Amino acid sequence: MSVLGRQAILQAIEQGAISITPYTPELVGPASVDLTLASTFRVFRKVHQVIEVRENTDYRDLTDKIEVPSGKHILIMPGETVLGITRERLRLGPGLCGWLEGRSRFARLGLMVHISAPFMGPGIDSQQVLEMSNFGPAPLEVYPGIAICQFVFQKLDGNEQYEGHFADQTEESF
């Protein structure tokens, strides 16, 4: 499986094999596309109980959905995790998959933009949920609209499609 470079990404977008909505050409880099942070977040409630890690445990039962007004920020305290979501909806056609990765400029501040599960399978058509955690020593102000992460595209041997639980997640269903 090979990683798509800028020209291959642009060609796949032009041919409809990759769809990014909204699409901002300036966010296409040499081997990835930057994705920006939406203004909707899920903040974990402070609980003093054990959370069972099971297939049917739903993060929505443990979080409150908030909207950050334009020009404002969400504050992520050291050791805290909040859920964010990309503004862009990403669709991958057959034969493509990819990886959601953080950006080193923010990692150096202690911000991890996804805890686990960076792989995105072929056929996804969704906004990407970000498990954002502050591993640094100080609170972090994070602003909606910032290019928070990047998506690296790969060619896939085969034409399989991902049809799992989060295949078509949006800001509304998040």
Question: Where do the protein language model's features map onto the residues?
Answer:
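DUTPase catalytic domain/fold
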Residues: 1-174
